[in-house]
Amino acid sequence: MKAQELRAKTVEELNAELANLAGEQFKLRMQAATGQLQQTHQLKQVRRNIAQVKTVLTEKAGE
């Protein structure tokens, strides 16, 4: 998701997105640990998406 799309969302929507991404990250980590994860790049993508959401939340908190 692009940063511009994230900035258009409300804080509640961003928190929901963050919870969703955290759950997805957990599932991917478990798949990687058991050797079932074929597309390992997904871990990096989810980690970066979490960072983007947290950054936008911090920006909104400063406003």
From Swiss-Prot:
Q: Does the keyword Nucleus apply?
A: no
The record lists its disulfide bonds as none
* Name of the coding gene: rpmC
NCBIfam families linked to this entry: L29
According to its record, what are the GO cellular component terms? cytosolic large ribosomal subunit
Keyword Lipoprotein (UniProt):
no
Q: So what family is this one in?
A: Belongs to the universal ribosomal protein uL29 family.
> InterPro entries annotated for this entry?
Ribosomal_protein_uL29 (IPR050063), Ribosomal_uL29 (IPR001854), Ribosomal_uL29_CS (IPR018254), Ribosomal_uL29_sf (IPR036049)
Pfam families attached to this UniProt entry:
Ribosomal_L29
Q: What is this protein called?
A: Large ribosomal subunit protein uL29
State the UniProt keywords alphabetically.
Answer: Ribonucleoprotein, Ribosomal protein
- Coiled-coil stretches are none
- Example of a GO MF term: structural constituent of ribosome
**PANTHER family given for it?**
60S RIBOSOMAL PROTEIN L35/50S RIBOSOMAL PROTEIN L29, LARGE RIBOSOMAL SUBUNIT PROTEIN UL29C
Instruction: Tell me the GO BP annotations in alphabetical order.
Output: translation
Organism per entry: Mannheimia succiniciproducens (strain KCTC 0769BP / MBEL55E)
